[in-house]
Amino acid sequence: MTIAITIISSLLFLIVGLVVGSLIFKSSTEKKLAAARGTAELIVEDAKKEAETTKKEALLEAKEENHRLRTEIENELRGRRTETQKAENRLLQREENLDRKDTSLSKREATLERKEESISKRQQQIEEKESKLAEMIQAEQTELERISALSKEEAKSIILNQVEEELTHDTAIMVKESENRAKEESDKKAKNILSLAIQRCAADHVAETTVSVVTLPNDEMKGRIIGREGRNIRTLETLTGIDLIIDDTPEAVILSGFDPIRREIARIALEKLVQDGRIHPARIEEMVDKARKEVDEHIREVGEQATFEVGIHSIHPDLIKILGRLRYRTSYGQNVLNHSLEVSKLAGILAGELGEDVTLAKRAGLLHDIGKAIDHEIEGSHVEIGVELATKYKENDVVINSIASHHGDTEATSVIAVLVAAADALSAARPGARSETLENYIRRLEKLEEISESYDGVEKSYAIQAGREVRIIVEPDTIDDLSSYRLARDIRKRIEEELDYPGHIKVTVIRETRAVEYAK
């Protein structure tokens, strides 16, 4: 019984619990549903608001896009209308231009037609005149042949000869002008090269004299030099070939002689005798012999020094010694060795400017006057002797030709030979390089003017520039332009044949024509 009550009680409690639980669940579910409905309503409300906002934004964007598109379309349409208007204007302008051109062409066609008619008429008139002119010319030719007794061919030959003479004259003038232009250009280039050479070559020159002075310690030494009955001075003069001048000059003896080597030997020997104090014929002979050996050695050293100075090697020793003798030779007061060194340097510089062999040019310049060292001992000109020496010692053919042609005796066969001749003239002809006696100088000037004035048509001549130029004034009525060139050549040839002079002489012929009228 108890168990049944217990079971019933349990069932009751279970039923009550289920009922209460269902009520609680229902209440909770209703609350959740209410909350869910509220949330759903909020979501729906928010969605509606958002949709409304989105709708407004979309409408706004659509309006803006519509406005932008409308603006673009309007702008495009406006631009197209403008282009269309411009195109229409251009077409109108072209039409107007075409109308004007059409009008102009019509006028031109009318003008051309009128000109063609005029030309046709003129051509017809010209043909008629040509026909008449031909008849007149034929009649004139017939009349001329009758009057002059010349046929047409003979008259034609005379006219052709006259034309040929005129053409020959004009050709000569053109050739002369071309020669003058070529000379001017070559002179400019040559002067440029020579100026560069002169700037790079500087040489000192001292005028050579024919006397030497030996200083004495006192005047008593003069008597000892003279010796008893003059035997000492006679011995010294006999051995050296030099004149001793003993005068009132205090403490000095003058040695006079044209051979510088002998004069140098006498000077050295006398200085040694004065220094030694023992002066008698035997001692004089001994000192002269020593002095001669010293001078020979000095000559060899001078020759070697000259070759070293210009950088020339492999010259024969005998030729070097002969070269050294040029130290004691002069030409118009100019020392020949110094002149040869200067020519060597100038020739080397000129060769360098023209791209020639500088060493060979220097060698030819150094040896160009080698014949002057012994021309007073051997018969022949210094050019001939120089060629013989160069050939004997097997010098280069260019060197031999340079020696032979530097005075124009032989034709130059190389550029170096021409350069050596130019350097020789440049060294010798510059002011102060060479000197002459006053008498010879005046005689040469007078001879220059005499030669110039010996020709017909010469009005007056003047020797200027220390005799290095002669200017001849001619009569314009007697001498024409072409004859003046021939006169200058003739005078130049006579000067070369009849005068001896250093360097060169410029011959200038001046022809002046004046036309004077007086207005009243």
UniProtKB/Swiss-Prot annotation:
InterPro entries: HD/PDEase_dom, HD_domain, HDIG_dom, KH_dom, KH_dom_type_1, KH_dom_type_1_sf, Ribonuclease_Y, RNase_Y_N. It comes from the Bacteria. It is a single-pass membrane protein. It is found in: Cell membrane. Residues 76-127 are annotated as: Disordered. It is an enzyme of class 3 (hydrolase). Residues 210-273 form the KH domain. One of its GO terms (biological process) is mRNA catabolic process. Residues 336-429 form the HD domain. SUPFAM superfamilies: Eukaryotic type KH-domain (KH-domain type I) (SSF54791), HD-domain/PDEase-like (SSF109604). Its EC number is 3.1.-.-. GO terms for cellular component: plasma membrane. Endoribonuclease that initiates mRNA decay. This is Ribonuclease Y. It comes from Listeria monocytogenes serovar 1/2a (strain ATCC BAA-679 / EGD-e). The lineage of its organism: Bacteria, Bacillati, Bacillota, Bacilli, Bacillales. The gene is rny.
